[in-house]
Amino acid sequence: MVSCSDKLTTSKAEKLIAEKLKEKPVEKYVTLKTGEISLFGYNEMRKADIYEKLQKEGLITFIKKEGLYEYRCSINLTGKGKKYVVDTKKIDRMPYTENKIKSYSITLDKVEEIHLIPMMNAAEVLTSFKVEKTPFVALEDQATLSAIGEGDYVSKKIEFIQLENKG
């Protein structure tokens, strides 16, 4: 991020971050196939547990038929689950539809601290973000789940660079 004034304050940092988030919101999505689906292999088959959890929450219907190396299943969104759908695409010649579903979004909570680095005309800002998760966040990969954590907040360091000739 770029700061144009000579002293970066908490309120200035929050304003700059909020402007950037307004310009480019942080919203993440997962794809959920609905209709008749086959799940192959360990990674796909482990999703069956997630689908069962989403069904218990009333977000989808999930019917599975176990095979030796695959699950054949039927997945459909309920009215409650459809509230999270952003886009739907019917796949030609396939017995399923791909649904783009909101997984989580991140908004600014607060700037926790600012560490100025005068020799580099820079600052390191420790920032807290609120993570608003939907129930479909469970479909994210393990790396994403680790990055956003289990709680409602995540901290991140952001570097600011002062541009003397711009303001």
Locate each region found by the language model.
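Accessory beta->alpha helical hairpin/"wing" motif in late/C-terminal subdomains of nucleic-acid enzymes
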Residues: I63-K102
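Basic amphipathic alpha-helical segments that dock to polyanions
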Residues: M45-I63, G67
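C-terminal motif of bacterial Sec signal peptides marking the signal peptidase cleavage site
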Residues: V2-S3
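Short, non-transmembrane alpha-helical segments in secretory-pathway proteins
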Residues: T9-Y29, D87-T97
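Post-signal-peptide N-terminal segment of Sec-exported extracytoplasmic proteins
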Residues: K22-K53
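Short beta-strand edge/turn micro-motifs at domain boundaries
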Residues: T61, E124-L126, V131-E132, A138-L139, ...
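Extended amphipathic alpha-helical interaction segments
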Residues: V86-L126, K130-E132
